[in-house]
């Protein structure tokens, strides 16, 4: 039996805890969640302790089941990529 949100695409522009948790719950129910992050450093939640082998376990939990895409939206090519992704999504999450 399929999950309730299979076939739904979510673009996740959230950071830290509340937004990523909401997006993770959508992934838990079968949505395809694509997390958009800054290139080079990702989102600040990657620094939350506890750390294991240089990776934040908290970040891993908040972002379970997601795909990750590093995009520089200040770069015209990066912005164009995001503009092309937006119409393919049924849900867009942000918490800026």
Question: How does the language model describe each region?
Answer:
Residues 1-96:
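N-terminal helix-loop segment corresponding to the beta1-alpha1 unit
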């Amino acid at each position: 039996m399929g999950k309730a949100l299979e076939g739904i695409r979510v673009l996740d522009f959230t950071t830290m805890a509340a937004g990523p948790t909401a997006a993770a719950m959508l992934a838990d129910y079968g949505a395809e969640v694509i997390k958009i992050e800054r290139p080079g450093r990702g989102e600040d939640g990657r620094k939350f302790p506890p750390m294991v082998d240089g990776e934040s376990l908290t970040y891993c939990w908040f972002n379970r089941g997601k795909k990750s895409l590093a995009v520089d939206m200040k770069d015209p090519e990066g912005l164009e990529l995001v503009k092309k992704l937006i119409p393919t999504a049924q849900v867009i999450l942000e918490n800026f």
